């Protein structure tokens, strides 16, 4: 590539650098993009670059594939209801071991390898996330019944003071989705939904959900059915038609929740696309699916 072409590419990003300068962007990082080494490098480099051009990324990570593998090694079968992991006490210990003990530190190390400053946190740090036990309902024979998810929580309150301090000091916060209830009990939080809550509390400009799919599609086996832009009413219609199911449901709940709390747009991108985060922020067309209120 000629030097002038490289310069033109950099200049193309200038309006977006100006627009998002000093803004917070919440990155929810999950899926198989977290276990692909090349994809992990792309994401880390993207986040460090964002920080150095004056944009403030905040990371909330999942770890579903690694948690599943750890459970299976210990003779436990992962169980999900509407995309939420059923969590008994032993499963919660495994979740914390994988999220806080392994994945969080791996992300921090990767960011620092590429020149960033990063601090690993969980929702337990500095009373960051207060949570309560989640009540889940299912429809059975036209009846609404309550199902017990175990030690699964939903966010009641996000105290942003610790994150604000870290962002001001030029650190990239990396947050594991474990919350604490008012009795001091740990609760497993769905990372997508927690990311939406934190994005809203932080007044983030964008929520970017880095996963292992290209975005929201009518048919997951047909890339041509990818939606580039969706509104909340359109998404609700897709759920009613059964086009959005399983693990995508919590992601959509997170999208709607974040938009309701003032986030301007939510983007679902494939972390296996090289530099998907930079492409989403700094190019006209972006990648993946953008979700807005209307």
Swiss-Prot record:
Chain sites annotated for binding substrate: 63-64, 85, 188
Annotated site (Transition state stabilizer): 28, 251
GO biological process: arginine biosynthetic process via ornithine; L-arginine biosynthetic process
Disulfide feature: none
Highest taxon, organism lineage: Archaea
The enzyme's E.C. designation: 2.7.2.8
Catalytic activity: N-acetyl-L-glutamate + ATP = N-acetyl-L-glutamyl 5-phosphate + ADP
Cellular component GO terms held in the UniProt record: cytoplasm
Pathway: Amino-acid biosynthesis; L-arginine biosynthesis; N(2)-acetyl-L-ornithine from L-glutamate: step 2/4
Record key words, sorted: Amino-acid biosynthesis, Arginine biosynthesis, ATP-binding, Cytoplasm, Kinase, Nucleotide-binding, Transferase
Localization terms from the record: Cytoplasm
SUPFAM superfamilies named among the record's database cross-references: Carbamate kinase-like (SSF53633)
Primary location group: cytoplasm
Main function: Catalyzes the ATP-dependent phosphorylation of N-acetyl-L-glutamate.
HAMAP family (UniProt xref): ArgB
Family: Belongs to the acetylglutamate kinase family. ArgB subfamily.
Entry protein name: Acetylglutamate kinase
Organism: Methanococcus maripaludis (strain DSM 14266 / JCM 13030 / NBRC 101832 / S2 / LL)
């Amino acid at each position: 590539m000629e030097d002038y072409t490289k310069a033109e590419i950099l200049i193309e990003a200038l309006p977006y650098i100006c627009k998002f300068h000093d803004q917070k962007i919440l990155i929810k990082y999950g899926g198989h993009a977290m276990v692909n080494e090349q994809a992990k490098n792309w994401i880390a480099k993207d986040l460090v670059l964002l920080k150095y051009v004056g944009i403030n990324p905040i990371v909330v990570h999942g770890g579903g594939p690694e948690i599943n593998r750890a459970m299976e090694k210990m003779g436990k079968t992962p169980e999900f209801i509407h995309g939420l992991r059923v969590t008994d006490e032993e499963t919660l210990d495994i979740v914390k071991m994988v999220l806080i003990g392994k994945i969080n530190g791996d992300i921090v190390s990767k960011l620092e390898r590429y020149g960033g400053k990063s601090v690993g946190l969980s929702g337990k740090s500095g009373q960051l996330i207060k949570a309560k036990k989640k009540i889940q309902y299912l429809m059975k024979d036209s009846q609404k019944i309550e199902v017990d998810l175990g030690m699964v929580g939903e966010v009641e309150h996000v105290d942003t003071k610790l994150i604000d301090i870290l962002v001001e000091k030029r650190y990239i916060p990396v947050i594991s989705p474990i919350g604490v209830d008012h009795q001091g009990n740990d609760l497993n939080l769905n990372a997508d939904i927690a990311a939406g809550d934190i994005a809203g509390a932080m007044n983030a400009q964008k929520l970017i959900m880095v996963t292992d799919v290209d975005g929201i599609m009518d048919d997951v086996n047909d890339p041509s059915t990818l939606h580039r832009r969706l509104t909340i009413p359109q998404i609700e219609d897709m759920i009613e038609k059964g086009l959005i199911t399983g693990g995508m449901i919590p992601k959509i709940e997170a999208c709607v929740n974040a938009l309701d709390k003032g986030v301007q747009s939510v983007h679902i991108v494939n972390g296996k696309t090289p530099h998907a985060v930079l492409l989403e922020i700094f190019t006209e067309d972006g990648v993946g699916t953008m979700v807005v209120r209307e």
